[in-house]
């Protein structure tokens, strides 16, 4: 029986709270146990948590940051609608960043948590999300 080929996997959780990073931990643990090489990409508190949990893994902290804030009062939907153009720009920057990183680091697979710019047409990419049904009032 042949062993499956080992991959270099980029795992990139969003920094909108530690839930995004902690949700990736079981996948990282499994891939490491299976002998894959995992490279992490995040910023802020998520990056700190990942570096603490996986001190021997490479961490790319130059990934574009969404710099999200939550409203202190009022509608979350309205708050994000106001920041839509900036968020869209970050998705574009994220996508360009990934194209470069795939070549520089020979990434063979991507797993992102709510980072919508991390897709590549030549390698498998997956996205983790907890949003099953986005309720957008103006659609």
Feature-to-residue mapping (PLM):
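Gly/Ala-rich phosphate-binding loop of Rossmann-like dinucleotide-binding domains
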Residues: 28, 32
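Short beta-strand/turn micro-motifs composed of small residues
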Residues: 12-13, 42, 112, 129
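Active-site-proximal region of nucleotide-activated glycan assembly enzymes
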Residues: 121-139
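A short, glycine/small-residue-rich beta-strand->loop->alpha-helix junction that serves as a flexible
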Residues: 13-25
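An aromatic- and histidine-rich active-site surface loop
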Residues: 46-49, 110-122
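Conserved nucleotide-sugar phosphate-binding/catalytic loop shared by glycosyltransferases and other
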Residues: 5-7, 15, 34, 39-89
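Conserved nucleotide-sugar donor-binding subdomain of glycosyltransferases
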Residues: 75-117
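A structural signal for isolated positions on well-ordered beta-strands in alpha/beta enzyme cores
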Residues: 10, 37-39, 109, 126
């Amino acid at each position: 029986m042949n062993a499956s080929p080992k991959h270099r996997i980029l795992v990139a959780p969003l920094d909108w709270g530690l839930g995004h990073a902690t949700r990736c931990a079981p996948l990282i643990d499994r891939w490491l146990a299976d002998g894959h090489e995992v490279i992490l990409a995040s910023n802020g508190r998520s990056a700190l948590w990942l570096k603490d949990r996986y001190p021997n893994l490479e961490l790319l902290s130059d990934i574009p940051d969404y710099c999200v804030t939550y409203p202190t009062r009022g509608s979350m939907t309205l708050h994000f609608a106001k920041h839509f153009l900036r968020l869209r720009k970050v998705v574009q920057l994220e996508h360009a960043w990934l194209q470069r990183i795939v070549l520089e680091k020979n990434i063979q697979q991507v797993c992102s948590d709510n980072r919508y710019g991390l897709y590549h047409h030549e390698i498998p990419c997956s996205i983790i999300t907890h949003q099953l049904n986005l309720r957008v009032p103006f659609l």
